[in-house]
């Protein structure tokens, strides 16, 4: 089991994903760069957690879409 992410990381990631849906992919490295450009996050750790959560959300959405089309 993984760790639970804090609410501020989840809310920031969801807000960025709603505002800039075309800027993010399922690649953590690309998302990390995009988060650094779009949000002023002074901490590298927080930036990486936000980018990781965005990556996870995108992968989850793609898997869900794939499952819906297969069914």
From Swiss-Prot:
GO terms for molecular function: structural constituent of ribosome. Keywords: Ribonucleoprotein, Ribosomal protein. InterPro entries: Ribosomal_eS17, Ribosomal_eS17_CS, Ribosomal_eS17_sf. It comes from the Archaea. One of its GO terms (cellular component) is cytosol. GO terms for biological process: translation. Disulfide bonds: none annotated. Belongs to the eukaryotic ribosomal protein eS17 family. PANTHER family: 40S RIBOSOMAL PROTEIN S17 (PTHR10732:SF0). NCBIfam families: PRK01151.1. This is Small ribosomal subunit protein eS17. It comes from Pyrobaculum arsenaticum (strain DSM 13514 / JCM 11321 / PZ6).
